[in-house]
């Protein structure tokens, strides 16, 4: 198996992802340490290591119910499965992501009032040389099914734990705002009652709700910067009470809604976050910072840098944290 080594940053990265992040103060002692060189290097000629992994834009990481780690990137073999120790298991799943590029959204940007230098998508989607440009997010639901988001195809796919396609949401290559369409979706989360919560995302600036079997239940949110509005809803998680937490990336905040989509409150000045991780004990990783459900920072990962560097991530049952970076690496942190 051959994995490309070309790494080019996404043309449409938000301004905040280039170094802006919320100031942190009085964050307690760090309980994590970084793991170097994860996953393990491939073995090359003569049994020698072939060098560290260097993917084309790691967009997300997920942890399967069996404990194995799924790494999503935009190169060949877009989903790779590893054991927690870093050994490669092999490619995962039968999903083929979009190879195409999204056409410039000049008219949409002008109509929305978005600034082209934010997430205005004036450039192609994905890195130069990417072969699976649509690979955007990967999540594992409570039953162990694997869900992947293909933004340019406007499609979300549900797979079994073995990688077999079970169901899709959206209509492939057909963008829109109907009950059966997305417009560049970004993430999916799973509510305690079984509902599916989708951030729909780059084009629609809304959050859509579906039943467990994929029936459209409704949507909430409009484009803007007021309460309950979005300028790119990019990541989403749901707590044990069914409250929905959405990263409003271009507005650099997290908005919280009840299970029906009613706006409740927001956390401001958190930077241009792309992804969230809900922990089993009901805390949220916002990039490299762990917060309680009131938004208070509890601790930060060592050397994690700006929270906005992480495009996606996951937490293992033993507390290990994995972050996927568009620079083409996976960062792993273990509890001390």
Predicted regions and their residues:
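Eukaryotic scaffold repeat domains enriched in small/polar residues
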Residues: 20-336
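Bacterial N-terminal signal peptides
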Residues: 5-16
């Amino acid at each position: 198996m051959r994995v490309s080594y070309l790494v080019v940053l996404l043309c449409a990265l938000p301004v905040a992802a280039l170094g802006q992040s919320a100031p942190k103060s009085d964050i307690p002692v760090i309980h994590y340490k970084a793991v170097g060189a994860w996953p393990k290097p491939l073995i090359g000629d003569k049994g020698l290591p072939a060098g560290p992994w260097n993917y084309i834009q790691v967009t997300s990481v997920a942890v399967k119910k069996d404990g194995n780690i799924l790494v999503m990137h935009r190169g060949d073999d877009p989903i790779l499965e590893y054991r927690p120790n870093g050994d490669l298991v092999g490619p995962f799943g039968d999903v083929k992501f979009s190879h195409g590029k999204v056409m410039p959204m000049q008219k949409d940007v002008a109509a929305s009032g978005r600034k082209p230098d934010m997430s205005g998508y004036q450039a192609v989607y994905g890195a130069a040389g990417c072969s699976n440009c649509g690979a955007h997010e990967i999540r594992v639901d409570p039953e162990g099914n694997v869900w992947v988001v293909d933004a340019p195809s406007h499609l979300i796919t549900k797979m079994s734990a073995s990688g077999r396609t079970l169901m899709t949401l959206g209509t492939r290559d057909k963008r829109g705002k109907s009950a059966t369409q997305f417009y560049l979706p970004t993430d999916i989360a799973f509510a305690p009652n079984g509902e599916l919560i989708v951030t729909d995302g780059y084009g629609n600036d809304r959050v859509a709700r579906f039943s467990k079997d994929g029936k459209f239940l409704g949507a909430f949110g409009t484009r803007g910067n007021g309460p309950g509005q979005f300028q790119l809803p990019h990541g989403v998680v749901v707590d044990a009470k069914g409250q929905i937490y959405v990263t409003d990336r271009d507005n650099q905040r997290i908005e919280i809604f009840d299970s029906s989509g009613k706006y409740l409150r927001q956390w401001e000045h958190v930077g241009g976050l792309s992804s969230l991780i809900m922990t089993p004990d009901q805390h949220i990783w916002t990039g490299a910072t762990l917060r309680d459900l009131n938004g208070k920072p509890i601790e930060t990962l060592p050397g994690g840098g700006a929270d906005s560097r992480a495009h996606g991530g996951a937490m293992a049952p033993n507390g290990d944290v994995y972050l996927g970076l568009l620079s083409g690496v996976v960062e792993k942190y273990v509890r001390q």
